[in-house]
């Protein structure tokens, strides 16, 4: 919204300069985006009249002009403008004047002394044709200072309004805001009813009453469409961003800027029969004022006569009924079109109009009569003519329901004491009707405020007018108490830090994934499909973290990163109801960073399993299990407290080939909820007595997992046994080909006494018996 500050100050003139006024508007929520001078600085330029323009004796393209500049004698000025002619009134810069980039001095031009310069718009820094002198109206007073006469000491104010403030898309609306903010008196232009002088009317019917709940029309005959638009009106239109055209059109545009009510003038002689407000019919087209012919859709509101659509309601008029210089009779239209009936239609047709911009946000349905009377009076004053009576069709207009505002809630939300009298005064200044009942205010918003509907809207208005910048800064005051820390859970940040300490880097990948990739990892998986995917390759929700981790691996390998260790903590999506959090990881390349002291080797299953055991702080129970994404001979299900907590293993060979990898990465995925649980640590004193170690070699079936044997031994172990670990797996000479030999190291220590040989032998025997009973294992000879 752009407007002239001088025009605004005709309506409300607070004791603030331009900068202070802009700051006050911005602080009240009406952001001033730009302040632009109406004209660049120049001085000593006056209105002049060319008395004569003779050809220069020594230059074909120059003229020697005698110019009346309001002084006793005419001034001689040499001019090269092609349109310099006697009788023209033009700007004249006298000697000593300073124009943008130039200072005027008395100078000889081809032997003729010139006492000033006749100016074009370009030389003054103004808009307009620059190929000749700037021609002023015939009524321009000779000798008058040009800046004062053209009101060039003005500022163009540009507001960046939010969509809810449609009431500020007019000078009256902005003036009302300034008055409420500053307390200055607001002088809203009053339009007295114009008495009809003729009885002519146009019949109006509204078929789409939901879209148009009020329509006013008026016939005005005998106008002079070629009448000159007054300079003050043309100036205000131009500074509001609207180019003056014909006087009748300028009048409707002026009312648009002043009152915020879009209007339209039809050439009455081009209308056939009455006016109907209806929805467009299939196949109808309309040639618009812009020259564009559009095909109308059935959800577009049109103004139609007997021949068909003549205007796109609330957006743009039609070419066939446009007002021209020869137009004598017009039909003025002012209406309230529902925002929902206009919104989006202009953009769909590639149009952007001031009318659509306002109707989409909501215009004041209570001021349509005032707009019609104002436009009629201006039209009669400028173009003459005889007005007819107003034809009106009114349906169900929007209602402004009362809103209850609790002063206690206002103070609590605002954080500042606002008195009832002040709140009532501020809301009344905005046009609200306010009634007080104890500590409650019952507020009825005005017809032009579509954005006031609930209590919070009124709180915003009260605080806005009080001034956001006046609310004192208060640091929050609250009791400080220590919160108990749940030591039975590991926080996500602690889990991430542990993974970083284990030499893994965190990654965050898309939750949206390619369905082909998910099904490659698990052909039987049930995918959760998105209703509106951002891309076809991101159309399902991930059911595992592995897909994103593998893509991250490939991304790094393509950038010559040969050693990759990454993890992600995030949700997977089995269904709408089941969305567990998982910890997934991947290791690829060398087990350790390259260095001279340790021979290089690739990371394997047991490296990653060891990382997870360090993460848990205890040995993991890795049992048999098959996952379609993992190598069947290099994978395991991970069990925690009797529950399957996840998977670990090398990527399946078919997927290594499918993902074009040189080797198989080792993957793991764990339920983060199981990971987060942990037992409270218990203190155990250090034993002062020596440890005893025994190495046992058990022969058992080759297909039996080492974990099964360890589980049996640990379950049978007496309290004196501190550790049971596998340190060798032998298959070969001396062991049947269907069997294997597992070497177990047993560490024993008592906290009360030194263990005797008998104690040790008894403990070992319990382990041997358990191995035989549970695993059919025997001691190797």
From Swiss-Prot:
GO MF term set: ATP binding; magnesium ion binding; phenylalanine-tRNA ligase activity; tRNA binding
Cell compartments where the protein resides: Cytoplasm
Domain of life: Bacteria
Keyword set includes tRNA-binding: yes
Cofactor(s) needed by this chain: Mg(2+)
SMART domains per record: B3_4, B5, FDX-ACB
Binding site for Mg(2+): 451, 457, 460-461
One of the GO BP terms on file: phenylalanyl-tRNA aminoacylation
Cellular component terms (Gene Ontology): phenylalanine-tRNA ligase complex
Keyword Transcription regulation recorded: no
Details of cofactor binding: Binds 2 magnesium ions per tetramer.
Documented EC number(s): 6.1.1.20
Annotated catalysed reactions: tRNA(Phe) + L-phenylalanine + ATP = L-phenylalanyl-tRNA(Phe) + AMP + diphosphate + H(+)
Keywords: Aminoacyl-tRNA synthetase, ATP-binding, Cytoplasm, Ligase, Magnesium, Metal-binding, Nucleotide-binding, Protein biosynthesis, RNA-binding, tRNA-binding
Listed InterPro entries: aa-tRNA-synth_II/BPL/LPL (IPR045864), B3/B4_tRNA-bd (IPR005146), DNA-bd_dom_put_sf (IPR009061), Fdx_antiC-bd (IPR005121), Fdx_antiC-bd_sf (IPR036690), NA-bd_OB-fold (IPR012340), Phe-tRNA-ligase_IIc_bsu (IPR045060), Phe-tRNA-ligase_IIc_bsu_bact (IPR004532)
Domain B5: 398-473
Alphabetical list of Pfam families matching this protein: B3_4, B5, FDX-ACB, tRNA_bind, tRNA_synthFbeta
Boundaries of every FDX-ACB domain copy: 687-780
Domain named tRNA-binding: residues: 39-147
Family from the record: Belongs to the phenylalanyl-tRNA synthetase beta subunit family. Type 1 subfamily.
Protein name: Phenylalanine--tRNA ligase beta subunit
Source organism of this protein record: Thiobacillus denitrificans (strain ATCC 25259 / T1)
Gene name as annotated: pheT
């Amino acid at each position: 919204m752009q407007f002239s500050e001088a025009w605004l100050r005709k309506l409300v003139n607070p004791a603030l300069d331009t900068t202070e006024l802009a700051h006050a508007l911005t602080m009240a929520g009406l952001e001033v985006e730009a302040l632009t001078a109406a004209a660049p600085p120049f001085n000593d330029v006056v209105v002049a009249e060319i008395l004569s323009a003779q050809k220069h004796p020594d230059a074909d393209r120059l003229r020697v002009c005698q110019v009346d500049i309001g002084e006793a004698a005419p001034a001689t000025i040499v001019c090269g403008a092609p349109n310099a002619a006697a009788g023209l009134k033009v700007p004249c810069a006298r000697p000593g004047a300073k124009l943008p980039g130039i200072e005027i001095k008395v100078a000889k031009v081809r032997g003729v002394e010139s006492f000033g310069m006749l100016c074009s718009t370009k030389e003054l820094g103004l808009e307009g044709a620059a190929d000749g002198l700037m021609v002023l109206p015939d009524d321009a007073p000779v000798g008058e200072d040009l800046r004062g006469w053209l009101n060039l000491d003005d500022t163009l104010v540009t507001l960046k309004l939010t969509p809810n403030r449609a009431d500020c898309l007019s000078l009256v609306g902005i003036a009302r805001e300034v008055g409420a903010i500053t307390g200055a008196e607001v002088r809203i232009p009053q339009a007295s009813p114009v008495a009809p002088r003729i009885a002519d009317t146009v019949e109006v019917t509204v078929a789409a009453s939901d879209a148009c709940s009020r329509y006013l029309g008026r016939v005005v005959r005998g106008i002079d469409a070629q009448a000159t638009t007054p300079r003050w009106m043309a100036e205000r239109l131009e500074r509001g961003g609207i180019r003056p055209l014909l006087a009748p059109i300028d009048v409707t545009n002026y009312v648009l800027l002043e009152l915020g009510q879009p209007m339209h003038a039809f050439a009455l002689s081009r209308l056939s029969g009455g006016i109907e407000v209806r929805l467009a019919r299939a196949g109808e087209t309309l040639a618009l004022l812009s020259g564009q012919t559009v095909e109308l859709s059935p959800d577009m509101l049109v103004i139609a006569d007997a021949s068909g659509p003549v205007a796109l309601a609330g957006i743009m008029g039609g070419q066939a009924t446009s007002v021209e210089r020869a137009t004598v009779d017009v039909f003025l239209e002012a209406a309230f079109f529902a925002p929902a009936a206009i919104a989006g239609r202009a953009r769909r047709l590639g149009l952007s109009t001031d009318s659509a911009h306002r109707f989409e946000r909501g215009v004041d349905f209570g001021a349509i009569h005032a707009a019609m009377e104002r436009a009629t009076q201006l039209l009669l004053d400028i173009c003459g003519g005889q007005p007819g009576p107003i034809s009106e069709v009114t349906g169900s207009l929007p209602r402004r329901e009362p809103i209850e505002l609790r002063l206690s809630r206002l103070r609590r939300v605002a954080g500042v004491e606002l008195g009832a009298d002040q709140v009532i005064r501020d809301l009344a200044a905005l046009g609200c009707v306010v009634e007080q009942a104890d500590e409650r205010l019952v507020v009825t918003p005005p017809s032009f405020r579509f954005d006031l509907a609930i209590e919070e809207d009124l709180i915003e208005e009260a605080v806005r007018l009080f001034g956001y910048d006046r609310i004192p800064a208060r640091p929050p005051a609250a009791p400080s108490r220590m919160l108990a820390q749940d030591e039975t859970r590991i926080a996500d940040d602690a889990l991430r830090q542990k993974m970083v300490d284990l030499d893994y880097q965190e990654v965050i990948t898309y939750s949206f994934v390619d369905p082909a990739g998910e099904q490659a990892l698990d052909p039987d998986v049930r995918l959760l499909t998105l209703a509106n995917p951002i891309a076809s390759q991101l159309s399902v929700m991930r059911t595992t973290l592995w897909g994103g981790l593998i893509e991250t691996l490939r991304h790094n390998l393509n950038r010559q990163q040969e050693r990759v260790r990454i993890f992600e903590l995030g949700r997977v999506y089995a269904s709408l109801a089941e969305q567990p959090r998982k910890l997934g990881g991947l290791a690829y390349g060398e087990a350790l960073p390259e260095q001279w002291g340790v021979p290089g080797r690739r990371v394997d299953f047991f490296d990653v399993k060891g990382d997870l055991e360090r993460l848990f702080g205890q040995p993991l129970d890795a049992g048999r299990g098959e996952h379609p994404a993992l190598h069947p001979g290099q994978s395991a299900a991970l069990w925690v407290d009797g529950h399957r907590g996840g998977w670990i293993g090398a990527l399946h060979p078919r997927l290594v080939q499918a993902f074009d990898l040189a080797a198989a990465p080792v993957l793991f995925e764990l339920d983060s909820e199981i990971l987060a649980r942990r037992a409270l640590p218990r203190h155990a004193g250090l034993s002062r007595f020596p440890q005893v170690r025994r190495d046992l070699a058990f022969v058992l079936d080759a297909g039996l997992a080492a974990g099964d044997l360890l589980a049996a031994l640990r379950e049978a172990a007496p309290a004196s046994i501190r550790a049971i670990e596998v340190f060798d797996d032998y298959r070969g000479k001396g062991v049947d080909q269907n069997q294997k030999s597992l070497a177990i190291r047993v560490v024993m220590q008592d906290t009360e006494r030194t263990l005797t040989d008998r104690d040790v032998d008894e403990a070992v025997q319990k382990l041997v018996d358990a191995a035989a009973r549970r695993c059919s294992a025997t001691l190797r000879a």
